[in-house]
Regions:
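Nucleotide-sugar donor-binding and catalytic loop/hinge architecture
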Residues: 5-22, 70, 189-206, 213
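Conserved nucleotide-sugar phosphate-binding/catalytic loop shared by glycosyltransferases and other
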Residues: 13-15, 21-29, 52-102, 242-244, ...
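Active-site-proximal region of nucleotide-activated glycan assembly enzymes
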Residues: 55, 65, 135-195
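Donor-nucleotide binding loops and adjacent catalytic segments primarily
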Residues: 64, 69-73, 195-278, 311-315, ...
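Glycosyltransferases and closely related glycan-assembly transferases
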Residues: 106-120, 126-142, 155-159
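Acidic donor-binding loop of glycosyltransferase active sites
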Residues: 116-118, 273-288, 295-296
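A short, well-ordered alpha-helix in the C-terminal region of glycosyltransferases
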Residues: 349-363
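C-terminal alpha-helical cap of glycosyltransferases
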Residues: 362-388
């Protein structure tokens, strides 16, 4: 099988004296919270070597966002057959469980074809079998946990990993002595968001993620009549997702709000820079972006998030004085309106939340993770001996 640092030949052939590329396996995916850190780490890994000196392979599934986002980033993607088991039952559980042997086979084949020096697991379905096979093949492993509450896969993998990179100190306490606090990798443009001078109109960015969040969309629409008496003090940018776009757009227009309603936002960092307040979910990446940009936020955690990790993320930010929190089951028009007006009337409180949010950011998260991987990686400078 051909590949970097490999050779084929017959008895008596001269040995291959080329130096083998230092190779990183990144496993996992599913949501943006898995894929964006994977891409950021892959790019930093490659940037530390000259042409041909380093390589990376990202492994995921065809169901996750990685299937689209990794190739768009110009990075190699390999797929395994695996699906989730936690929180499901009935026929779907047995159907997904039946994929486990295939997923382990696919993982073993990928390990066989490549000569990885270190492996990085970002969580998600593909992370489990790939990191297990990496461990069984004596490849040093690092798993990454971006949430305050560790996910199921990472709780299992932490016992066998060489190191655990965590975004929060309290997570490190839970996962033990192998933990290293690195922070959460965030795109550079969020750290470039400057402090905002606050003036009217008060600019609110509302987003439930790239696909939108129906509960947030419904709550905002239900709040518009209560917000209307002060609508001339407000400018709203609302990312709805495709499904609710038209209904939400019409609701703002009927009440003559100053608003920009869009199904999707391409340059989110630019929108963060314009915002005085962000109303959003509290996934790990979103929370890290809010911190990096130094913005005040009202977090509305996704109620069905696995292990309630979004609630724990939001609670940590609230405890630090960096955000407000509205549980989804309390998300009525009165509560949302009161929170918005409270912050509109307290610019000093907004400024304090911004300072505290920015203080939680870790600008070197990507570099620190790659430092950790470099320190654990098996020496890659030896002669290529082929991939067996």
């Amino acid at each position: 099988m051909s590949g970097t640092g490999s050779f084929s030949g017959t008895h008596g052939a001269a040995p291959d004296t080329r130096l083998r590329a230092k190779s990183l396996l990144i496993a996992g995916g599913g949501t943006g919270g898995h894929v964006f850190p994977a891409v950021a780490v892959a790019r930093e890994w490659l940037a530390r070597g000259g042409e041909g000196e380093r390589e990376v392979v990202i492994v995921g599934t065809e169901r996750g966002l990685e299937f689209k986002l990794v190739p768009q980033a110009g990075l190699p993607l390999e797929l395994i057959r695996v699906a989730g088991l936690k929180g499901i039952g009935g026929v779907k559980f047995f159907r997904n469980a039946a994929l486990l042997p295939a997923g382990l086979w696919d993982s073993a084949e990928i390990i066989r074809r490549h000569r990885f020096d270190v492996a990085f697991g970002v969580g998600g379905y593909a992370s489990g079998p790939m990191m297990l096979l990496a461990t069984l093949n004596s490849i040093p492993t690092v798993i990454f946990e971006p949430n305050v509450e560790p996910g199921f896969t990472n709780r299992v993998l932490a016992n066998m990993a060489s190191r655990v990179a965590v975004a929060h100190r309290e997570t490190g306490v839970r996962l033990g002595r192998k933990s290293v606090v690195t922070g959460c990798p965030v795109r550079r443009e969020f750290f470039s968001v400057p402090p905002k001078e606050h003036s009217l109109p008060f600019r609110i960015l509302i987003t439930g993620g790239s696909r939108g969040a129906a509960p947030i969309n419904r709550a905002v629409v239900a709040s518009l009549d209560l917000l209307a008496p002060r609508k001339n003090q407000l400018f709203v940018v609302h990312q709805t997702g495709e499904r609710d776009y038209n209904d939400v757009r019409v609701a703002y227009a009927q009440r003559e709000f100053h608003a920009e309603v869009v199904p999707f936002i391409e340059n989110m960092a630019e929108r963060f820079a314009q915002a005085d307040l962000i109303v959003c979910r509290s996934g790990a990446i979103t929370v890290a972006e809010v911190s990096a940009a130094g913005r005040a936020a009202i977090f509305i955690p996704f109620a069905a998030a696995t292990d309630a990790h979004q609630m724990r993320n939001a609670q940590a930010m609230r405890a630090a004085g960096a955000a407000r929190l509205i549980p989804q089951d309390e998300l009525g028009p009165g509560r949302l309106t009161n929170e918005i007006f409270s912050l509109l009337d307290q610019p000093r409180r907004i400024a304090e939340m911004e300072q505290r949010a920015r203080a939680l950011a870790r600008p070197r998260a990507v570099e620190d993770i790659v430092d950790l991987l470099d320190g654990l990686a098996r020496p890659a400078g030896g002669k290529g001996v082929g991939r067996q």
